Regions:
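Catalytic tyrosine of NAD(P)H-dependent dehydrogenase/reductases that use a Tyr as the general acid/base
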Residues: 4, 12
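Alpha-helical segment proximal to the catalytic Tyr-Lys
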Residues: 20-24, 83
Length: 106
């Protein structure tokens, strides 16, 4: 987990540094930090229905994300509507990082 956390932090720091370096050339640099999403890779590993339900419950929105959700975020950052956004990390996780793990009522 140490290598994963360190590399994720490095990508975020690199995004900010590159935004500063390339901003004067009108080049925007942003980062997308996806949360757990349902993809063909997950499907091929035969994630159990219970596992998928646990991931859905971890989302504040109560839905399961897909690769399309990540793609839509990237498309937004590439669009003219994001012309004033640079050096930012857009977390696309349905709010999963806003709260701790889902708990069963006691």
């Amino acid at each position: 987990m140490t290598a994963y956390s360190t590399s994720k932090g490095a990508v975020i720091a690199l995004t900010r540094a590159m935004a500063v370096d390339h901003g004067p050339d009108s080049i925007r640099v942003n980062c997308v930090a996806p949360g757990p999403v349902y993809t063909p890779m997950v499907y091929s590993r035969q994630m159990s229905p219970a596992g998928r339900e646990a991931r859905r419950k971890a989302s504040v929105l109560g839905i399961e994300g897909t690769g399309w959700d990540i793609g839509y975020a990237v498309r937004f950052l590439l669009s003219a509507e994001a012309r004033y956004i640079t050096g930012q990390t857009l977390v696309v996780d349905g709010g999963a990082t806003l709260v701790g793990p889902a708990r069963e009522p006691s």
